[in-house]
Amino acid sequence: MKTFGSTYRRALTIAMAAIMGFTPMLSIPAFASSHMDAPLITRDPSANTTDVYAFVRPDANGNKALNLALGVYPHQNPGIGPNKYNFDENVRYEIHVALGGDIAAGRPTLTYRFEFNTAFKSQKTLLQSYLGVIQNLDDAAQNLTQTYRITKIDYRNGTGTFIGQGAVPPNNQGNATPFYNEGDNGENPARKGVATATELDKYTRQAIVTFPNGYTAFAGQRDDGFFGDIQSIFDLLKLRNPGKDSQGGYNLHLMSLRVPLSELGGDQQTVGVFATTSRAMAPAQSTSGRGFLDLIRRPQFVQVARQGNPLFNEGLVAIEDKDTYSRTLPTTDGQIFRKYAENPELATLINLLIGGGQQLAIDKGRADIAAIFIPDLIKIDLSTDPVRLAGNGPGAATNPDDMGFSRLSIFGGDILESRAAGHPFRLPSQFLGLPAGKFFVPGGWPNGRRFGDDVVDIAIIALLSDLRNPAALKINDPFMGNYDGVTGNEMGFNKVFPYESTPQNGRNIVGMK
């Protein structure tokens, strides 16, 4: 561990400087964000962030933990070969956690950095990823292998601590990777979500690593768990029922990290979470020509994507500022992006295109929407009981959703008792029609975000409603929580770490339309 001193913290407002000899980043202009949120991200898919998840669930010993996940590299068609979708060793993937006053300031207190390395067992073959049927993680048949290391950066004291390292399982090609699929048969579709760790496929089980410091990690390909009819939304809001899941059948790459709450100072608090990716650019140069950087020629890293709450950059920020969002930190959100949350154009479009000019949604002075998105960190109350989880749907024969889980979160009656102040949507029980004396927060987004939260419908209901006065909440849900006609993920979800479902099989794809 190396310490840089008190000046490190002050420098954070300019750049989240890297630790352990790494070079500063984020002070250089950058390019993009999320599934397809900003124009320039289409040129850099492996650095493109898709979704951030943060929720409270217990670890293997029953202790509450903060589960974090970052999805990248969207729109992976499983049927395309050779399968070249991989993490990028020239990209730093980072999940940031803000504590205390850092939440309102929009700056990270801690950063968890994932860095990858790629190797081949043999390059004297055209078989890039698979030399045969892969029986176990990193066996002789897995030609392309990736490993990763995780570093925790603490901006309070300028330290970097090695958390651990792991190996990435193979992508799901089909016959080369049979154990991902039903009946361990490469001709069958990928396994749907499961309820226990022993039911996970072999490759996923082998790739989950638990470190002596209490962290648990996974990095690898998964089914894209985001669901929504994005095509119809951007086709002049011509919503349809049933809708078509725009991410149905596609894979992505996921990094999951389970963080002990002792690492964050306990559970009597709210924390903020967001993520960034940064790409290695030209090697750094010393102005003197004799500096240390010239000797080691470390690359500079440029932030190319940022992701916090779902849909913000895609659904609220104007085109002229989308790339600005990608290259900035949440520290500037109040100055640059507050206007988009307080005066959401999407609400205006709902009134125009769906309401025919009638005011269905309030489109000015939305302090309630700004409380969610500004600064753009997912705020999560750690004081609650563990969240309820999505499985394979309500009433599914195997691995059904938890009792009380609602994809609509608070709008579906899914709430959790809050035992500590701090969350912007912490409501007194009497405001929810319950006996006075307690406080509650949403069971899912915008209190954290779970796999299975229907963020499209939640966002639309929030825009149609008036949440500005907690004592007089006005919930407007004319379509009963079904706006884009998509209510779940075709593969379901696991109810155990790493939670996102098995990657789709290239030979037998489920849900692609």
Task: Give the positions of each predicted feature.
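Bacterial N-terminal signal peptides that target proteins for export
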Residues: K2-A15
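Generic alpha-helix initiation/capping and coil-helix boundary signal
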Residues: R10-A11, M25, N494
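Short stretches within intrinsically disordered, low-complexity N-terminal or propeptide regions
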Residues: T13, A17-I19, A32
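Intrinsically disordered, low-complexity segments enriched in polar/charged small residues
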Residues: I14-A15, M25, A54, G412
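C-terminal segment of classical bacterial N-terminal signal peptides
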Residues: M20-A30
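Surface-exposed extracytoplasmic segments
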Residues: A30-K513
